[in-house]
A protein has these predicted regions:
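Nucleotide phosphate-binding site architecture
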Residues: 2, 34, 93
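Structural microenvironment flanking redox-active thiols in thiol-disulfide oxidoreductases
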Residues: 5-51, 62-71
């Protein structure tokens, strides 16, 4: 999905900033395909194409229902991408659904500001 691509590029750019080098990013992909082998191949191709510099896992088929099963602690997953922010104890402190990419102008700028402020706060804990 285009928003997933934009989010991946954004998170990869964060990993290049000194402030966020210690942040651990992990992607759980929900992919189209007839079976998990096909889905995993699609996910690996995506990771190679993007030059992914953080870990990735297959969550299952591309559906919000499947994502809700995998992330059963949430009250549901309603869109892709959905980002979970965890503290150092591994507790979910914030969930963000969707992604306002560069094409959204000021909305992308605001997303960057709020995301980076949250990450700085979590790193200080």
């Amino acid at each position: 999905c285009p928003n997933c691509l934009d989010e991946t590029r954004y998170f990869m750019s964060l990993k290049e900033k000194d402030d966020f080098k210690s942040v651990r990013f992990v992607m759980v992909g929900f992919e189209n395909g007839t079976n998990d082998k096909d889905r995993l191949q699609r996910l690996k191709k995506y990771a190679r194409k993007m030059g992914l510099n953080y870990g990735f896992y297959l969550g299952g088929e591309a559906s919000t229902k499947q994502a809700g099963i995998v992330f059963h602690a949430l009250n549901g997953v309603y869109s892709f991408p959905t980002t979970l922010f965890l503290n150092k104890k591994g507790e979910i402190v914030q969930v963000h659904s969707g992604f306002d990419g560069p094409g959204t102008g000021i909305h992308f700028t605001r997303l960057q500001q709020t995301t980076e402020a949250l990450l700085r706060k979590l790193l200080e804990e």
